[in-house]
Amino acid sequence: MENFPTEYFLNTSVRLLEYIRYRDSNYTREERIENLHYAYNKAAHHFAQPRQQQMLKVDPKRLQASLQTIVGMVVYSWAKVSKECMADLSIHYTYTLVLDDSSDDPHPAMLNYFDDLQAGREQAHPWWALVNEHFPNVLRHFGPFCSLNLIRSTMDFFEGCWIEQYNFGGFPGSDDYPQFLRRMNGLGHCVGASLWPKELFDERKNFLEITTAVAQMENWMVWVNDLMSFYKEFDDERDQISLVKNFVTCHEITLDEALEKLTQETLHSSKQMVAVFADKDPQVMDTIECFMHGYVTWHLCDARYRLHEIYKKVKDQDTEDAKKFCKFFEQAANVGAVAPSEWAYPQVAQLANVRAKGDVKEAQKPILSSIELVE
């Protein structure tokens, strides 16, 4: 395995953060912890239900890690929506992360998908059955146009995960395949549309801005994720079907060339995101900017992405990019580094165990143990 291109990664990250004028001021520390715990607590109770436990069949440690990661993403990024909306979105996106980590073949359970859908029957695929049950709780926050985007994008995501089951990075010469798959499993339209709850935005009045935001967010969100995930995925055998690796296969280019391609597209998208909305409705621009800054903070602070390892590696280096990266990292940590023990309690497994005893109050006590570690 070749060495990770640390200097290139530092330069790319710094340019990205400079382009979006990174300065996360979305919350006070108290507000952040309050929102984290509210969203987590509701979502934890949801996944501790017997039906969810029986149908998902997810390892408790993995489910706990997935939930903590997603709650962080939603609370940090969807800073303008209500706590109730944050909680419902956290549940929805946790379902998507659970599916993304699954290795089950969906084919048998999807044979009668449309017939069951048309007849109003419960889906044979357990993931679809549970997601469909929760969807009304999500869609109640949004108007019909945004809701349609959430539904359609979730269906695309399922198809993208299905494709990934084959660990297929594309055929050489199939230049459209990498972006096709990334758009399919990126949830860009779902994310872009879920920024505009009807209690804050009239989707008819802001239709043009919302439509443009969905279009722009589709690429920006997934490309930033791919860049910020590049370090953790670099030598992980489970993450070899990534956009960068698929560029290498399909475009028949080197890894450095593929990373440069992603870098240029991400930076261009970031410039567009800022420029397009600069003179639009201030509330729209504020929502987008808060999302971008919170999304970056989440990546820098969530242990899943291991960017603290980069920070420790380069904090004593004297290069300009190393200094800038460390300054940005410390800036993010000052606002976003919150230990899970301060908000991620009770654990889902504990809730599930005590539910039958009717002693849910006991499970509400903070836990200062394994939840400190997020996969």
From Swiss-Prot:
GO MF annotation: an example: trichodiene synthase activity
Record's function text: TS is a member of the terpene cyclase group of enzymes. It catalyzes the isomerization and cyclization of farnesyl pyro-phosphate to form trichodiene, the first cyclic intermediate in the biosynthetic pathway for trichothecenes. It serves to branch trichothecene biosynthesis from the isoprenoid pathway.
Recorded name of the encoding gene: TRI5
Metabolic or biological pathway, per its Swiss-Prot or TrEMBL entry: Sesquiterpene biosynthesis; trichothecene biosynthesis
InterPro entries: Isoprenoid_synthase_dom_sf, TRI5_ascomyc, Trichodiene_synth
EC number: 4.2.3.6
Enzyme class: lyase
Other notes: Trichothecenes are sesquiterpenoid toxins that act by inhibiting protein biosynthesis.
Superkingdom of this protein's organism: Eukaryota
Catalytically driven reaction(s): (2E,6E)-farnesyl diphosphate = trichodiene + diphosphate
Protein name: Trichodiene synthase
Family per similarity comment: Belongs to the trichodiene synthase family.
Keywords, alphabetical: Lyase
GO BP, sorted A to Z: sesquiterpenoid biosynthetic process
Pfam families, A to Z: TRI5
Protein's organism: Fusarium boothii
